[in-house]
Amino acid sequence: MKILLSKQQTRKIAIVSETHGLVFRPINSKNSRRSTCAVELVPKAELNGNGFRRLSNHEIYGFIGLIEIEGLMFIATITGKSKVAQPIPNKTVNKIYAVDFFCLNNSKWDFMDIDSSGYPIVTNDGDFAISSPPSISTHSSRSSLRSSSSRSLNAQEQAPKHPCHELRKLLSNGSFYYSTDFDLTCTLQKRGFTEHSLSFDDFDREFMWNSFLMDEIITYRDRLDVTAKELLDQRGFLTTVIRGFAETIFSYINRLKVGLTIISRQSWKRAGTRFNARGIDDDGHVANFVETEMIMYSSQYCYAFTQIRGSLPIFWEQDTSLISPKIQITRSVEATQPTFDEHFIRLFKKYGPVHIINLLSTKSSEIQLSRRYKEQLKNSEKMKIGRDVFLTSFDFHRETSQDGFAAASRIIPKIRNTILDAGYFSYDVKEGRLISEQDGVFRTNCLDCLDRTNLIQQTISLAVFKLFLEDFRLVKPSSFIDDNEFVQKVNALWADNGDQISQIYTGTNALKSSYSRKGKMSFSGALSDATKSVSRMYINNFVDKGKQQNIDTLLGKLPHQQVVELYDPICEYVNERLLESEEKFTTHSNINLFVGTFNVNGNSRRADLSKWLFPIGDKFKPDVVVLGLQEVIELTAGSILNADYTKSSFWETMVTDCLNQYEEKYLLLRVEQMSSLLILFFARSDRAYNIKEVGGSTKKTGFGGITGNKGAVAIRFDYGATSFCFVNTHLSAGASNIDERRNDYNNIYRNITFPRSKTIPHHDSLFWLGDLNYRITLTNDEVRRELRAQKDGYIDRLLQYDQLTQEINEGVVFQGFKEPTLQFRPTYKYDYGTDNYDTSEKARTPSWTDRIIYKGENLHPLAYSDAPLKISDHKPVYAAYRANVKFVDEKEKLNLVEKLYAEYKNTHPEALTTGPDELSHARMEKQKESIPLDATVQSAGIKLIDLDDTSSCVSPLLSGPSPQPSVVGPGGLSNVSPDKSKLNVLPPPPPTSRHNKEPSSKLLSPTKEISIVSVSPRKGESNLPALERHSTPKPLPPVPALSLSKPVSLQKSSSELQHAKETIDNGKIVPRPCPPIRRKSSTAPDEISTSTKNSGVSTTEDPEPAKASTKPEKPPVVKKPHYLSVAANKLNTSQEHSIKVSPSNSKSEEELPCKKKSKPKVPAKNPELEKLSVHPLKPCDPN
């Protein structure tokens, strides 16, 4: 494809395929604050005569969406790619190494190349480099063009950095992949071997990283008719991008040539860098969730096995500001349970039974996570251990501490039953029939789900792959050794996969990759791991914040970030009617809030908090409780540098016990601690389901931002469709330090950042509470005299000299904040255990240091007072509010939208599309003088002339002869091949593969090898590599549905099973391996297995009886067979076949029983299959 620009009448940009063009033009919409553009799918011929010309020399390999940056709309395209994988014949996977963003509503960036720093390339004389078509003989990549030009300082100052530069860097870093003929978002088992449509209806949006960019385009597509949808899907206009890893290597198993592929897909739902994305979110999505699939394809069989990884599905975080980041669990067991269950229900529906492999250490730093993990599993009423989920704890560090990483294979005996019961996906290529399906999945995790997880997933994958090879008698059990070439290549693939996942999450390659690649750990490998660890520490503290910002921008998760809206007359009508009918899908409700602040002065003794939390008993029961505590640890140098985070647990327990003394139960939804500051967020159990997007943040301001004795901890959440933010602060002390407190406030207000880059101003309701340390500016004697006299109006007289009241009234700080009427005595400073103000030598002036102020039109204060507690030198303060919150019924809103669309179409029949030639709502006016789009033009000169003839720029010189200008003359576009079939522009050469040293990879072919070429084929050329051209059948017919009513019998004679099928290849008889004989399999384990060092014994915990009513609903799944056999002469299906394992050897095997499964029907043979040529194999050895 190519990208064209026209400035006739209105500015338009078109992405043009061989037959159609997708035309975009900006729209100034009066009824929408969002950036809006119109899109039209038109036949290519309609672009003639509309002034279109090439906007870029680079071939467009895919359109990946629209995005708004800094008020500008950009069209995102793939302009550089290399072919890296071929999981099955005719299906290729490409790595993205270059993208371009073309501005739709501004001409500033037209015809410009951008350098690696994001600035336009300029020549030595200061002119900007204008893109010009290279000559046919030129194979220079974009980097060579840029290296031939230099930017002058003056020119750089004139031209700003490209707004999409950071996104270009992110998308071009080698971790993004796409395919034009293969659905990368689904596993091979789900996709199947039928002629699979690349329809967006079939894609798994969880792995589609350009989902935000394509959101409106997909909506536009869904409203088209079937013909138009097929055009968009099949012509490359809609491209799905995944992030992860994909690579294929080729090897031989005995004499059978095979392609070995690993594809990893990372979910974008909770995407981010290591310390910015931990645990689970409110929708049940976990950080670093990756689905990894290993595929083997040969001319005889296809095999696939899928595993998943993901962060522990509980709410936990780590403080990046510490050298040894502390693990903090931020939500209680009860509050976490619904989200925890939702996560596993989703996995169960998608993969079947889930076997958890927990690799966390039993050391104190990780043991709390393991304990919480098991507690959540046991408390689940929807997922039952031993039925839906299975847990194996394997302390990786302890198991490998003595015998090295080879001891990781000890995991296999512990999970053998699940390996046999879940099976693997296998397909008979020759006969075009499904043999087995995987039913179940291993979910592996460590702390980061990287290094330990990589090694265990590799170990499990090799064990299952060995099982497949033995079952299909492609290798003998004794011949499968680690020195085999294909085993070494598989190990190298897994090492590359681990490095790529680690690069995405941490910015460095994986630890232990030296062992993964070579099977042994050398001194250089250990030194490399130490270097990576130091690099990770630097990246975590100085780089990850910017990377997280770029990821959130790409995914549309920044505050108030919206998709580029596609103009649609119907959409305009619907939006107007939605505003008028908002009350039909929107409801409002009042909730009660209780907010408290207390400087506890390091107190660690239990006390009754009822007078603070329930000042009027059970007459007021809040829906939400937020408490801010200060000085939960003593403010000494030692305690500040080594904060005791166990104090948070002490206060959590004491507050929870007090809140739950009545019938209503409260759940802890968030705790945030920074040194001596702590904020607790509780909600009533029957209200917790309304709360989403809970997040926390901290900011240090003590000693210039170094220590946490002063600063802020904050939490935010959404209650329905209303957002709340609470900031608990401890500002600088001292009556004269007003400027320091102003600086603290501004520093906190600007720098508190929640997940997805939300900040304090982005919320509907704000609360600022804590020990604000504002004083009364009268003398100590004057204040105490007023407090002793208690004359009428003494509180108001003292408030006139209150620094905070003065600051708010002057608008210096806390702009827009209000404080309820203050009618209580100063809360600081008291003698401990009394109601007497400070009698020490310092004799502090009594002041209202402890305050609660608010901001929000939906807030109505009900009460504001102190509480008579005597456990600190401060008095606790509380405030009660009634908040009006909004709820949006999304289902009702969607129903209303559909009704409005139907209503509009009934009253405006002209808005309906009538066929493939009228695919858009409004056509551009077609000029009478139609100029052929592909006409050849002969022109001279080196200038690119603007269509409006207002400017001209000199094109940069390329290697070889001077390029011809890209001017639209009477003949149309230049740089077109003589046969008018394709533009004569060659893309940059792809990078050399890591495994195949030659410039082109050797493809899977039994008889011939042909190189992989990343350049799109020209018309008339074949796009099929060797395997497709010589040994691959045409797309196989659909596999018939399996039926439980007709169990498949395997009662075949020994001679039938041992007799090799024959195929004819050029007159030669080529025997095939015997089909595998299945084994019996035992059921999955009904226990929680916990590894014991140097032991294969598992401790068993009896699960509770299963509750049928609480079992998660799973779509009807027909059990598919998987054949697991070791000996062809064991034909009695009732007999238990087994593999013997010696517990003393990590490579040996215990008895692995299998259970019977059904066998699918065999469809009629495809005559094309008989044309396959395969390598000759010896007849099967029954022994």
From Swiss-Prot:
Molecular function, one GO term: phosphatidylinositol-3,5-bisphosphate 5-phosphatase activity
Entry's localization field: Cytoplasm, Cytoskeleton, Actin patch
GO cellular component terms, semicolon-separated: actin cortical patch; cytoplasm; mating projection tip; membrane
Compositionally biased residues, Low complexity: 133-153, 955-968
Enzyme Commission number(s) of this protein: 3.1.3.-, 3.1.3.36
Secretion signal span: none
CDD domains (alphabetical): INPP5c_ScInp51p-like
Effect of D771A: Impairs completely enzyme activity
Catalyzed reaction equations: a 1,2-diacyl-sn-glycero-3-phospho-(1D-myo-inositol-4,5-bisphosphate) + H2O = a 1,2-diacyl-sn-glycero-3-phospho-(1D-myo-inositol 4-phosphate) + phosphate
Role this protein plays: Dephosphorylates a number of phosphatidylinositols (PIs) like phosphatidylinositol 4,5-bisphosphate (PtdIns(4,5)P2), but also phosphatidylinositol 3-phosphate (PtdIns(3)P), phosphatidylinositol 4-phosphate (PtdIns(4)P), and phosphatidylinositol 3,5-bisphosphate (PtdIns(3,5)P2). Controls the cellular levels and subcellular distribution of phosphatidylinositol 3-phosphate and phosphatidylinositol 4,5-bisphosphate. Specifically functions within the early endocytic pathway and actin organization.
Origin species: Saccharomyces cerevisiae (strain ATCC 204508 / S288c)
Composition bias type Polar residues, residue spans: 1046-1057, 1082-1100, 1130-1145
Protein name as catalogued: Polyphosphatidylinositol phosphatase INP52
